[in-house]
């Protein structure tokens, strides 16, 4: 375990140097890993584990997702099973179903958690809010987590490029004395570049805050506010979109990712530099109270309850689709669709 200084704070980090793939294979050589769910994280994690030489099976209900698993090379009756059968065969159960689905199938999973098995998560929601989800594992199994900091699609594509995605990890329950080794081996096996230590609660709180904040909710709100302001002041849709979204995603974000915002501030025009320095304070002051309110809503379980209650309503899917359609049909994103078509690589 390496100790890395992040901005003056030392954290425990596991890298491929400390825990190489060969060691991971040795740790898990007698294990059968069942990946439950072939939706968001399931395909990337299961295929990466398979390609890295681990003994992997998939548990998935019949339907379109089951058919997708077959297309990806999983063989019904050999490496692709019902959720119940996969749980029976596994020594490590990767519980990668959606939060709502985890609540639904938990009785089946729990019934097959015999002593010594490991229950693996990639998100701490079900455990952190187990007073609401009723996902309470027996005391004689390991309960562990590796949470990739990106989508399952990114996990797979970076793996195929010979790279890796960063992940957090946590040990909730070590019944066998092997929980940490199992966690490290699985993290390396799914293609993590490096792993930093956290807890189930902290992963859940930061993840839910991020999704509702800068990763999705806040950025959509911020982009829309600027786009609307430009449109209301006479700017055309294409100009408003290019100045709000296109320049951000195509020019600035790649540099932001490679070199950091501090580098961008030091390497832009003097006009942009002065304006950015002057206005970052007002934007910080305007949004900080919103983030504090959001974090409190996450930490108290309010956001979890909203999610659970919403998903349990019989008409939720219909209403959700209507919300998503409204977003899709909005002027800003219809403009974006045309702007993307006009990019040189798409012409």
What are these regions (language model features)?
Residues 82-135:
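Rossmann-fold NAD(P) dinucleotide-binding segment
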Residues 66, 86, 102, 237-241:
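Small-residue helix-packing motif on alpha-helices
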Residues 177-232, 238-256:
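Active-site-proximal catalytic alpha-helix in oxidoreductases
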Residues 2-77:
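NAD(P)+-binding Rossmann beta1-loop-alpha1 motif at the extreme N-terminus of oxidoreductases
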Residues 120-212:
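Rossmann-fold dinucleotide-binding core
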Residues 40-45, 64-67, 102-105, 128, ...:
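Short glycine/serine/threonine-rich phosphate/pyrophosphate-binding segments
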Residues 2-6, 10-17, 232-347:
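NAD(P)-dependent Rossmann-like dehydrogenase/reductase catalytic/cofactor-binding core
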